[in-house]
C-alpha cells in the first residue's frame, strides 16, 4: 500500500528567514489515500513573540505555549522524523511548510526534508480549477467538505480537511469508495469461509422422533403431490 503523510503547520509569522518560527505541526498518515487513524501533533515554544496578524489567523497565544517544548526536543523533532519516515509529504502551498520545517531542522542540526518528497496540493487544485480561488477553505466549500468544526485555522483540523481535499483531487470519493468496497469484499470472503465451512462437530437434531414422524405423515398424507417442491422434481 502507498503511504503518504498529510501535514500542516502554524507559525509566528510569514518567513523563517526573518526569524519567524514554528509553533504547531500536525500530520495524518494515509494508506492508498485513506486515513489510517495514525497522527502526529505537537505545539512548540518559539522563543519569540507571535505577530498579531498570525495570531488572528490561528488563535495561538504565547501564554498558551509557555509550557510547551522547543522544536529541538526529542519528543518533537526526532518524533516527527520517525513518524514521517521516508514517505511523501502532502501540504497545501508546500513551500511555506517546507521552509519552516527545514529551518527548524537545520537549527536542530538535523537533515532537511528534500524538496522531491513534497506533493503540493495548491498546483494540483490550480490545474483542476484554473482561474479560481484555490485556498483550503475554497476547496472545502467546492467539494462540500464541512468546515463546521473549525473556528480558526489550526494545524490538526486543517490537516484533516486537507486529507479530504487531497482525496478529491486525486480522483474523488469514488476511488476511496472502491478501496473500501475491496476491503469489505475481502472481509466478506473471510466471513463466508467461516459461515459455510464444515462444522468440526455436527449439530444435534432439534426435533424429536415423534415430531419428525408427524411431519412425514403430513407431507405424505395431506400435501402429497401439491407440495411446491414436487414441481422441481425434489
What are these language model-derived features?
Residues 1-116, 126-130, 138-152:
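Conserved non-catalytic scaffold segment of RNase H-like nuclease domains
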Residues 130, 153-156, 205-209:
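Short, well-ordered coil↔helix boundary/capping segments
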